[in-house]
């Protein structure tokens, strides 16, 4: 490890249990909640910003697509790939998640990984995976930065207990919570779905509870 600024001392004196905590970084995101590649609700921290996220894959893109086994080429009929998609977007074709690698035209694009179906899938709908991100500064109940109603200051360098409560059918609220200083949950952010959505925001409520670290 190379120092990028002058050190306060090169002969540090350690206490009983010296520790090093990493609280800021670039190029990676830590996520925790109930989610998979297509649906879910989770907290995330990217080394600088804490956020609450709702992931959906119910938005169908225009037209239909054709996918061939072991090929990364997706062709469309009546599609508008250039207008609706871009590189690094994620789409779902016949239940499988693919990352858009290149959009050649409104009717042709390339994805990764290759389509893994057994047979050619023609005339099928494709869905776009969307992440609805609410940054900490946008939390509508408590910004948990020491300035909210609870006075709680969320320190990403320390162990935290987080919570999420939701109704998966799409018309309920999603509440993002963290355990406060007095042991009670602090409600930080609420995402409203009632009188907002026209369909369920997730395809299933049967989601794994997981912690993930992804490189961006």
For each of these PLM feature ranges, what is it?
Residues 1-58:
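Secretory/extracellular carbohydrate-interaction modules
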Residues 59-87, 92-130:
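Small/polar beta-strand repeat architecture
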Residues 158-172:
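Localized edge beta-strand/strand-to-loop motifs within extracellular or lumenal beta-rich domains
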Residues 181-203:
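Short, solvent-exposed beta-strand-to-loop segments that form ligand-recognition rims
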Residues 206-211:
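Noncatalytic modules at the cell exterior or secretory-pathway interfaces
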Residues 214-216:
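Conserved small/polar residues in nucleotide/adenosyl-binding loops
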């Amino acid at each position: 490890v190379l120092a990028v600024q002058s050190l306060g001392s090169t002969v540090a004196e350690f206490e009983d249990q010296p520790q090093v905590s990493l609280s800021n970084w670039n190029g990676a995101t830590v996520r925790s909640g109930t989610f998979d590649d297509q649906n879910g609700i989770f907290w995330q921290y990217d080394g600088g910003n804490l956020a609450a996220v709702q992931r959906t894959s119910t938005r169908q893109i225009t037209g239909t697509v054709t996918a061939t086994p072991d090929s990364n080429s997706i062709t469309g009929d009546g599609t508008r790939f250039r207008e609706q998609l871009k590189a690094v977007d994620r789409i779902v074709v016949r239940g499988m998640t693919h990352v858009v690698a290149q959009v050649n035209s409104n009717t042709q694009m390339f994805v990764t990984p290759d389509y893994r179906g057994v047979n050619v899938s023609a005339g099928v709908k494709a869905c776009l995976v969307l992440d609805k991100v609410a940054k900490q500064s946008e939390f509508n109940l408590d910004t948990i930065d020491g300035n909210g109603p609870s006075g709680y200051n969320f320190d990403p360098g320390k162990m935290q207990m987080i919570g999420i409560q939701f109704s998966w059918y799409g018309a309920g609220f999603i509440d993002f919570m963290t355990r406060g200083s007095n042991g009670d949950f602090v409600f930080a952010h609420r995402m409203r779905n009632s009188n907002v959505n026209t369909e369920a925001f997730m395809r299933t409520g049967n989601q794994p509870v997981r912690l993930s670290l992804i490189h961006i």
